[in-house]
Amino acid sequence: MDKRWSLQGMNALVTGGTKGIGEAVVEELSILGARVHTCARDETQLQERLREWQEKGFQVTTSICDVSLREQREKLMETVSSLFQGKLNILVNNVGTLMLKPTTEYTAEEFSFLMATNLDSAFHISQLAHPLLKASGSGSIVLMSSIAGVVHVGVGSIYGATKGAMNQLARNLACEWASDNIRTNAICPWLITTPLISDLLSVEEMKKEAEERTPMGRVGEANEVSPLVAFLCLPAASYITGQVICVDGGLTVNGFSYQPHA
């Protein structure tokens, strides 16, 4: 295989890799030859996924981590540094959560929790990973954002704020760390069939309206996001950095079009 299209010999960290987009990303990177470490809060899920990945022949290791907690993030990066001998090629900050409420009803605790889980974790883990990414000689960071950081989609103002901040973080790190040969990009999915939004998609009226407003006429799947993550980490993408890329079936570019019936 052309080395531009292979991750053979590369090390990757994917946060929240036991389900949804994170699980798809772990598998995508593994298929392309990367050695992957992933973390999650649920030990049972970690063990279940690990067995599945081992059966597929993937080089995956796991550890328990709640990325909303600073001390656990520090412990995670110590583990990763030890596993990969102080070098990391790929960091995918994938963990995220949402809480649907009117803005006036959020508590201070809920604000802090969403900020810690979505934004603080991505910022701090990127900070901690910097020396490892630099040591690898060629690093790639992918921030899993959302179109809620680009346009209003009614999934909560705090969630949207965290994702908008992640998009700008990707741009800033791309410029600041370019001299260290570290690239940073953000990916902004729309509705993707994952456990995180299963309750939303179970509301038939909501799902129908979302599909009608999406030019491609459907919600996405996790394995339609993971290939983009993998591509951005490939040597073939070596000149792509600071980009915020929407994976949304065309939603964010859709204005208004009237198609008269024949």
From Swiss-Prot:
<feature type="binding site">
    <location>
        <position position="146"/>
    </location>
    <ligand>
        <name>substrate</name>
    </ligand>
</feature>
<dbReference type="InterPro" id="IPR045000">
    <property type="entry name" value="TR"/>
</dbReference>
<protein>
    <recommendedName>
        <fullName>Tropinone reductase homolog At2g29290</fullName>
        <ecNumber>1.1.1.-</ecNumber>
    </recommendedName>
</protein>
<dbReference type="InterPro" id="IPR020904">
    <property type="entry name" value="Sc_DH/Rdtase_CS"/>
</dbReference>
<dbReference type="GO" id="GO:0016491">
    <property type="term" value="F:oxidoreductase activity"/>
</dbReference>
<dbReference type="Pfam" id="PF13561">
    <property type="entry name" value="adh_short_C2"/>
</dbReference>
<feature type="binding site">
    <location>
        <begin position="13"/>
        <end position="37"/>
    </location>
    <ligand>
        <name>NADP(+)</name>
    </ligand>
</feature>
<comment type="similarity">
    <text>Belongs to the short-chain dehydrogenases/reductases (SDR) family. SDR65C subfamily.</text>
</comment>
<dbReference type="InterPro" id="IPR002347">
    <property type="entry name" value="SDR_fam"/>
</dbReference>
<dbReference type="GO" id="GO:0005777">
    <property type="term" value="C:peroxisome"/>
</dbReference>
<dbReference type="InterPro" id="IPR036291">
    <property type="entry name" value="NAD(P)-bd_dom_sf"/>
</dbReference>
<keyword id="KW-0521">NADP</keyword>
<feature type="active site" description="Proton acceptor">
    <location>
        <position position="159"/>
    </location>
</feature>
<keyword id="KW-0560">Oxidoreductase</keyword>
